[in-house]
Curated annotation (Swiss-Prot):
Catalysed conversion reaction: cytidine(34) in tRNA(Ile2) + L-lysine + ATP = lysidine(34) in tRNA(Ile2) + AMP + diphosphate + H(+)
Provenance organism: Pyropia yezoensis
Designated name of the protein: tRNA(Ile)-lysidine synthase, chloroplastic
PANTHER family associated with the record: TRNA(ILE)-LYSIDINE SYNTHASE-RELATED
GO cellular component: a single term: chloroplast
Superkingdom to which the source organism belongs: Eukaryota
Similarity section: Belongs to the tRNA(Ile)-lysidine synthase family.
Residues bound to ATP: 32-37
Organism placement in taxonomy: Eukaryota, Rhodophyta, Bangiophyceae, Bangiales, Bangiaceae
Single Gene Ontology BP annotation: tRNA modification
Comment field on protein domains: The N-terminal region contains the highly conserved SGGXDS motif, predicted to be a P-loop motif involved in ATP binding.
MF GO annotations: ATP binding; tRNA(Ile)-lysidine synthase activity
UniProt entry tagged with the keyword Transmembrane: no
Cell compartments where the protein resides: Plastid, Chloroplast
EC number: 6.3.4.19
Amino acid sequence: MFQNSFLHKKFISTIEKNNLLPYNSSLLVSFSGGQDSLALVKILYDFKNIYNWKISLIHFDHRWRSDSMLVSKQVIKYAKMCNLSVYYFECPKYLNTEETSRKWRYLTLINTAYVNNFNTIVLAHTATDKAETMLSNLFRGTSLDGLSSIHWSSQLSNAVHLVRPLLNCYRSETSWFCRKYFLPVWIDQSNYNNSLSRNRLRQELIPYIKSYFQPQIEQKCYLLSSLISLDVDFLEQEALRIYSLIQHEELLAMNYLVIKLLHPSLQSRILKIFFISNLDLNLNSIQISDIILLINQSISTNINISNYILGTDGTWLYVGAKTKCIKSN
């Protein structure tokens, strides 16, 4: 057992500072066989007895590549070598896009953790992933939330939370770690298919930026994303606090006179909270802008949104079905 590398020390400092993986935790670790997940499993295994962690692995075979079965066999072989149990899932054939497969993967992760009494799902996302996601979202057009979308931890339910303990580590560091300990990294050839925008960003754009503009682009993106996260957390907490004070006790309605006094940033966040929590509707920016215009200019015209009617009545901004207000949950 080796626990003396700088990455071991960085890992322990991180989980203790952020209280990510307490003693006696039961961990379900997503394991692809790539360098990041191999480094994560190796480090967790090295500290397993010290922290009394119960560790199991979960592997997803998307069957998109001809060598996917060989990868799965290697993953299972490595799990047996470490005396760790592994859950293996094949992606249904009808899920043939990255987005649908990602949703299936996360739902399967959560369900497996819940059914088998794991209290923590562990993912191997790194600071490099965070930088790539930030740039990718920026190019597509996003809000502050999209620039800080990968977090240290997320509470998925009362029983299960998700953590990313390598989020301040870089891909160059996990690569070094795997070479140092001779870990059997499986190279995913699809990562070099530059017809995919994410791969082109990783293989061409970021190296170009490093060479000609900012050698520490990953570190700069990570720092910026972390600073944005602080602002996003504050705005979200403030929006939740105000929403709890202005919502109607019985009907789907809010005091729009109070909303009218707020900054547009808080107005939009409160509206998103209102529609997601009550109607499970994720409004787009145009719909949000229309509602804010309705509020700020006290327009009496109703707005139709997904079979609901949004209007104002006295001091209330309400959601109605036909002529009746809907009762709150």
